[in-house]
């Protein structure tokens, strides 16, 4: 009897300890999520979260990633995190193979804020915690949308990036790294404001972001904010909401002075240069079609290096006289050494 009582007491004690060991966090869909005290086996089905986790030096705690991470992060990203090459890929932004996921025995799964509710339920139903990341704040009804309507876009993405980094860092128990990453992300905003504060709205450089198949970003996305902070104007913002495919006629009408292409889509540059339909656009006439460096991630969602480095790169490209004294190469290499633990190696991007 005493032995039985002792066993029951031990069991209750262990259960109590387990309960105390769990943590409750709030994700960026405002969901309360209970996660283990320590994360040893995370699955990351969102490329933005994966990039932040790499910068937090948390890849040893990751066992699975989204299937198209190379396309989303660019073909050269593997140099920054070679350990990703051999990781399991049990799903993507919009779906999950539940059997493959279960085989990994994950402690937590990160998904994007617009992951289908059925996908989140599918994972939750097998008792795996799901953390949704948006890297933005804003109105409640917009939190789960890919293309939101935001009252104050700048505040939504500034606050949301900070909140998102801190949340991911909390899950991985990387608070110090998270605090340092947030600080680095916003470190150059004053520099840009001081140098470009006198550029009036009508003098901003008219800029177009060229994605594959005439995709571009309009209002409600970080892309336009990157341009704004760098003294540019997103020509698509007035008529396009979110990420959308447009027509060549739209681009001809907008007639941008500069065309930007993201590092992850290098084939878009020769496609534009070799298509006579684009020839009369001002950016083509002035030879200002720029392939952006990998750190200048002008994505719909903000990345810390995009704020810290990408906005400076763009400002320097558009207003070289105002930033002659800024040693961007040193700035970039210092960031890479600190957060990617390697040197920056430029590919073919405009510098």
From Swiss-Prot:
An annotated GO cellular component: periplasmic space
Sorted UniProt keywords: Ion transport, Molybdenum, Periplasm, Signal, Transport
Main location: periplasm
Gene that encodes it: molA
Subunit structure: The complex is composed of two ATP-binding proteins (MolC), two transmembrane proteins (MolB) and a solute-binding protein (MolA).
Family membership noted in the UniProt record: Belongs to the bacterial solute-binding protein 8 family.
Limits of the Fe/B12 periplasmic-binding domain: 41-322
Protein name, per record: Molybdate-binding protein MolA
Location(s) in or outside the cell: Periplasm
